């Protein structure tokens, strides 16, 4: 099955890497697989690639970890 993943800009990917290294909290908005939009302050933990798709691993304010597909992120700014 072909993925509908659309790679993000390398510069933006680098910004996520820097945020992970600096343990910077981010205010992130994204849509999930059911098209629900989420807005949350998160701490980025890691970047992962799986089956040609890239994900940001984050911890929410409640400590729960999740993976967010990079092309589903709508907006990101420092918290």
Question: What positions do the PLM features span?
Answer:
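Short acidic/polar mixed-charge low-complexity motifs
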Residues: 34-38, 62-64
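Short beta-strand-centered aromatic/proline hotspots
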Residues: 38-48
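Short glycine-rich, low-complexity segments
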Residues: 1-33
